[in-house]
Each structure stands twice: as structure tokens, then as C-alpha cells.
Amino acid sequence: MDASRCGDPIRVLLVEDHSGFRLVLRALLEADERLIVVGDVGSADEACAHPMLEHVDVALVDVGLPGTSGIEATKRLRELNPDLRVLIMSGSGFDRASDEALSAGADQYLEKGALHHDLIEAIVQAGERGRTTSAR
């Protein structure tokens, strides 16, 4: 079921330490009516403490966060919200970190240079899978 058809946009939390890139991502995602960005933060600690975390469908997390890595953030976020879908982003392509991210509970590993359509579709698909799983 398409979330936009039932009137409930997929709620996204952006976790990216580069504020300029975070603003661009937010604008890109908010341009799609199927998505709503409920927050954007620059660290794993901010993400884990976000007041809307229990209502987030998908977290889009940078692998290279300062302090706590995106991989460790994935583990913590999934512990705090087991229904959360986590998509890890990296600017360095697919490497050992992709395996680590998936092992940590990430649903998908994406390159930051991915076409915006591919990024949005990955978020929508992850959000819809999460809603299907949590409804059971």
C-alpha cells in the first residue's frame, strides 16, 4: 500500500553532520508528498534523544558521524525503536562499512551520490516495509 494514498506520509529523521548537505537533503525529501521530515540532527546522540524517535518510520543516517559512528547509531536507534527502518549513507561508496552497517541492522546502504529519485524510492520502500511489518 502506498503511504501517500492512505494519507499518512512516511516520517523521516535525517542524521547528517554536514549542515549544508542536511539542508539539501531535507529540501529534496520535503518536495515529495509521500515523505515528511520530522527532524534533522547532526549526531547519533541527538538522533537517539530526538523527541519524535518513537514515531519515525525511516532514519537516514550518515555512516561517518563524529563521535558515535553511523553504524553504532544504527544499533542504538534500532534498540530504541525496533520498528524503525535505517538507511545508511556514505560518500565513499561500497566498502567494508556496507557489510558492517547491514550487520548492525541497517536496511540498506546508499551512496550519497545516488540519484535523488533512487534515494526517495529507497526511503518510501523502507517506510512501507516497516509499516507492513509493524502492523502484523
Regions found by a protein language model. Name each.
Residues 72, 93-110, 114, 121:
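Alpha4 helix (beta4-alpha4-beta5 surface) of REC/receiver domains from two-component response regulators
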Residues 63-64:
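The short loop immediately C-terminal to the conserved phospho-acceptor aspartate in CheY-like receiver
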Residues 40-58:
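Acidic, metal-coordinating helix/loop segments flanking the phosphotransfer/catalytic sites
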Residues 96, 114-127, 131, 135:
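C-terminal output helix
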Residues 16:
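Conserved acidic carboxylate
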Residues 43, 69-72:
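Acidic catalytic/metal-coordinating carboxylates
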Residues 71-83:
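Short amphipathic alpha-helix used as the core "switch/output" element in two-component signaling
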